[in-house]
């Protein structure tokens, strides 16, 4: 079964298109846009995105590494990106998980609800597979290299994470199951651990 579900890079244009829009809307603070690509968006998420958008210039060099999801038309996506902070020269490489599925209207959307036990187990298992572990390690190494090359990067990231964590501390315990929740909250290596622990 695992051989039939190997990690594929940029294999589905429709997934790449959805993920690109998701990150474009997020960096722009466009909550209406996000609502068009997510199955739901909470008030807390809207507030977090609006508060952090001034620190974020954009997400660059996005690449989607996919495994098939639990159902036809669904995908577990490990998104590699380089997060460009405003006024910081060096982008921060990161890796975030998203779960994408086809809704009743036939459109691909980003799952943003409460994950089932089955989905949690599936994501956790996938995150420990060799191909994903190698991808996580590669992204973590790139992030460490970027941080070592630009001391301002780590400082700006701390500010960004504080904004995200301040607005999500109260909901962390209830939302830790949803794999995509990390995407906008945790750039760089923070995701490496959360892919493992959270879903």
Annotated model-derived regions:
Residues 112-128:
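Short, solvent-exposed aromatic-acidic interface loops
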Residues 23, 38-41, 68, 79-83, ...:
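A mature extracytoplasmic/lumenal domain signature
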């Amino acid at each position: 079964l695992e051989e039939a579900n190997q990690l594929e890079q940029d294999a589905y244009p429709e997934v790449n298109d959805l993920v690109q829009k998701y990150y474009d809307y997020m960096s722009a603070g466009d909550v209406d846009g996000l609502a068009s690509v997510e199955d739901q968006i909470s008030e807390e998420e809207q507030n977090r995105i609006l508060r952090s958008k001034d620190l974020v210039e954009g997400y660059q060099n996005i690449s989607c590494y996919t495994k098939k999801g639990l159902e036809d038309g669904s995908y577990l996506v490990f998104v590699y990106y380089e997060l460009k902070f405003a006024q910081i020269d060096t982008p921060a490489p990161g890796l975030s998980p998203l779960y994408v599925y086809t809704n009743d209207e036939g459109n691909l959307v980003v799952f943003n609800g409460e994950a089932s036990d089955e989905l949690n187990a599936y994501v956790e298992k996938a995150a420990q597979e060799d191909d994903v572990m190698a991808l996580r390690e590669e992204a973590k190494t790139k992030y460490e290299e970027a941080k070592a090359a630009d001391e301002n990067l780590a400082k700006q990231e701390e500010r960004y994470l504080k904004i995200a964590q301040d607005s999500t501390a109260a909901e962390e315990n209830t939302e830790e199951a949803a794999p995509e929740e990390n995407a906008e909250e945790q750039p760089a290596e923070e995701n490496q651990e959360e892919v493992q622990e959270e879903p």
